[in-house]
Amino acid sequence: MAANNKKYFLESFSPLGYVKNNFQGNLRSVNWNLVDDEKDLEVWNRIVQNFWLPEKIPVSNDIPSWKKLSKDWQDLITKTFTGLTLLDTIQATIGDICQIDHALTDHEQVIYANFAFMVGVHARSYGTIFSTLCTSEQINAAHEWVVNTESLQKRAKALIPYYTGNDPLKSKVAAALMPGFLLYGGFYLPFYLSSRKQLPNTSDIIRLILRDKVIHNYYSGYKYQRKLEKLPLAKQKEMKAFVFELMYRLIELEKDYLKELYEGFGIVDDAIKFSVYNAGKFLQNLGYDSPFTAAETRIKPEIFAQLSARADENHDFFSGNGSSYVMGVSEETNDDDWNF
């Protein structure tokens, strides 16, 4: 960084830095023409390009498919999505917000503010699915189930102390764990159904959510590694031990939850393997090797195919609100443009 730029940052504060400095000093605005870390600009451009809203997805086209499902399957889907809503509520209101306080750059602060908003959109998306497909009784019962299901509550609460704790690195690990691992057990169900041509538009929403989660996990993993590399080797080893210990603890909580959730539907073992596979991917994103065997992470081909953001989409992406689109750019024309 040039000397003048260093002086600029040393003599001014971001709004959050101003608060931390006991409301002393001069405030600065975020300057996208002076980027400390090019990864910030790259990720910002990607998340803006990927912006979407659930109202643009024709979930109502899934009503015929929904009506063909038994009540047990309908209740399972509703419970699963309500569980995902809880996790996204935590991430939007605590997890990503806490990362603003630990940001390395001004731009990282606003990126996590954007993440928090989009995770709020994800939580709203499940509400869109509910209001389209479910009865009020099903929705209310599912939300009551979330409050009263201990296995779900345990896994949902597990990361909150690290979000709000005093260790920025542990908070960053937790911020990556939610989009990088903890949601995937719930994602398994819509991908399983989509591979069987059921609820295809609902699955499109899940793919859009997944596309965002991949970026959120990647960015948190990248920032974790940038923080970690500045630490002494002993601290790096300590953090690695922490990550693996927390990961294994969460896997056990996830297994307990998935066994309770999916019992009787014939998908428990495959859902667990799907989760463990993504646990390995999460560890790799933090710069560690996956310790899991091929047998522990074997995913059926039809499920693996659903991980593609372009898999079997069902609506018009010209408007730029699908998972395989490129945002259209409009330009006004004049008479001369049509003189061929």
Swiss-Prot record:
Cofactor: record remark: Binds 2 iron ions per subunit.
Tagged with keyword Ubl conjugation: no
Any Pfam family: Ribonuc_red_sm
CDD domains, per database record: RNRR2
Catalyzed reactions: a 2'-deoxyribonucleoside 5'-diphosphate + [thioredoxin]-disulfide + H2O = a ribonucleoside 5'-diphosphate + [thioredoxin]-dithiol
Keywords, in A-Z order: Deoxyribonucleotide synthesis, Iron, Metal-binding, Oxidoreductase
EC class of the enzyme, as a word: oxidoreductase
Cofactor: Fe cation
Transmembrane segments: none
Entry GO terms, CC: ribonucleoside-diphosphate reductase complex
SUPFAM superfamilies: Ferritin-like
Top-rank lineage group of the source organism: Bacteria
InterPro entries with a match to the protein in the record: Ferritin-like_SF, RNR-like, RNR_NrdF-like, RNR_small, RNR_small_fam
Active site: 126
GO terms assigned for molecular function: metal ion binding; ribonucleoside-diphosphate reductase activity, thioredoxin disulfide as acceptor
Example GO biological process: deoxyribonucleotide biosynthetic process
EC id: 1.17.4.1
Binding positions for Fe cation 1 per the UniProt entry: 88, 122
Annotated function: Provides the precursors necessary for DNA synthesis. Catalyzes the biosynthesis of deoxyribonucleotides from the corresponding ribonucleotides.
PANTHER family per record: RIBONUCLEOSIDE-DIPHOSPHATE REDUCTASE SMALL CHAIN, RIBONUCLEOSIDE-DIPHOSPHATE REDUCTASE SUBUNIT M2
Name of the molecule in the record: Ribonucleoside-diphosphate reductase subunit beta
Species per Swiss-Prot/TrEMBL record: Mycoplasma genitalium (strain ATCC 33530 / DSM 19775 / NCTC 10195 / G37)
Protein encoded by which gene: nrdF
